[in-house]
Amino acid sequence: MPMQQQSRRLASAVALLSLASTVVLLSISLDAAKAQGVKPILEPITGKEELGDLSQPQQALAQFYRAFNTRDLKMIDENFAHSDEVAIDNHLGGIRRGADQPHVMYEGVFKSPADVHVEFWDYTIHRAGDVFWAVGRERGTYRDGEGAKPLNIRTSRIFQLIDGRWRQMHHHGSIENATLLGEYQNAVRSAASKSQ
């Protein structure tokens, strides 16, 4: 068999093995989710819940939403890991990486008169060892001038168990409605620039 043909077969075999491995890994995740009976939780997390010792995923989520809705930067800092591996990707700040970025981003939101309030709902929680991730939706309002406007965001948050407490490592948020996205960005950014 010519060398070129052997190389093609080897490349094809490697590609198939890689594809099969990916399918198996995805199947394991899907099977694990099915085994956990993952159904969306519709009862919202508002931040008014009992925080307890922050050893449970829902407590860590409640801590974040309490910090956000009460404009508590110290609590935001406590909720996020103190690690340069922290990453945030959302409609206000783009992709931000580093231990100080949650503080910087949320400080801008909190200084804004847009007065954003949200709750987390229609979510699932998934856990693998020292990591859990929550995937769901945020709904709430923000102020634009004199009136309140609705806010709907697809959201995911990843936490890592560090010294017995869940610390947020990653947040991603997306606003599907392009008009709403533009209005929200303008309200928060213009208000934040006026307050500086």
Residue ranges and their predicted role:
Residues K34-K39, W133, N152-G182:
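Short beta-strand edge/turn micro-motifs at domain boundaries
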Residues S21-A32:
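C-terminal segment of classical bacterial N-terminal signal peptides
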Residues A32-N79, D100, A187-Q196:
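Short, low-complexity N-terminal intrinsically disordered segments enriched in polar/charged residues
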